[in-house]
Each structure stands twice: as C-alpha cells, then as structure tokens.
C-alpha cells in the first residue's frame, strides 16, 4: 500500500486489525516532518508498508497503546512490535531491512550523522513559528535571527556551507 491510500483515524475510531505479514505499518500524520522522515526511509529502501494517519487534535483512545504519549511516527510490524521516535524508527528500518544502506557502517561517521541531526532539531520548530508569525502579520525578526543562528550551528557542525541557501 502507498501513502495515496491512507485514512485518518480519530477519537471513537476502531483500531486497525493486525499488520499483515510482509508489511510494516506506519502511524503518521500528513503534515508532520518527523513522520515524513520515516516515510522517506520506507520509500528509499523500497519497504512494503501501509500508512494510517492519526488525527493529532482528536487522537483515538486506543492509539495510546501504540505510543505512551500519543505521538507520531510509530512503526508496527506483524509481530506487534512497536518502534517510535523518528530517528530510532529510521535507524531500525535501515538495520532490519536489507538493500541499500542509508546510514554509514563506520561507527564514527554514524555518530557524526547523529550529532548533525541533534543540531537540526530546533530548525523545524523555529521555521514553523516564523511562518505563523508572518501569516499573522507579526514581527518575526527575533525568530529569523534564532533560525539563522541554528543554521550557523549546523554549518559549523557539518563543515559545509548552507547559509548561502538561506
């Protein structure tokens, strides 16, 4: 199944049945960058999967059995094993499924990738805050400055020039 055939479940919905053998289920949300990270890995590795979107403003009661805080993304396999948190889910997919490796084999390079991801964590939130401020006609100069600083941190950490794009 592909992302095109998704359904969104909310409060009062019936939980989906068991995950079929040979497929992994992704509990997601259409506009969540963390869930999209997991979707990208599923596609890049060619992993057969189904997507069930969760209404995060009106979460189904049963969903808290999938994630203790009701967050997304969550992976579920046919053995009822659950994996959540996007970075952990992506690493699991890369390790558990054969084919093209997305993470380096070298422990140092793998650690560097994780450190770079840590530096990136503030960027999506600041970007969203800035866009909301602009949409509402509020001044976002301080948010732009903070976002620029995060890009500087990323640039320092990655030893690449990314500010030229911003």
For each of these PLM feature ranges, what is it?
Residues 1-164:
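GST-like domain detector, emphasizing the conserved glutathione-binding G-site
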């Amino acid at each position: 199944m592909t992302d095109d055939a998704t359904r969104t479940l909310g409060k009062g919905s019936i939980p989906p049945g068991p995950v079929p053998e040979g497929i992994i289920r992704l509990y997601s949300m259409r506009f969540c960058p963390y869930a999209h990270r997991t979707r990208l890995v599923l596609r890049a590795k060619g992993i057969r999967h189904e997507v069930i979107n969760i209404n995060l403003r009106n979460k189904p009661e049963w969903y808290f059995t999938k994630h203790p805080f009701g967050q997304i993304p969550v992976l579920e396999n046919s053995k009822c094993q659950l994996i959540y948190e996007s970075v952990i889910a992506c690493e699991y997919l890369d390790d558990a499924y054969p084919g093209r490796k997305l993470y380096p084999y070298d422990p140092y390079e793998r650690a560097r990738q994780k450190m770079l991801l840590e530096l990136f964590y503030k960027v999506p939130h600041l970007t969203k805050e800035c866009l909301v401020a602009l949409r509402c006609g509020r001044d976002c100069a301080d948010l732009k400055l903070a976002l620029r600083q995060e890009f500087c941190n990323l640039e320092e950490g990655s030893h690449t020039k990314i500010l030229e794009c911003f």
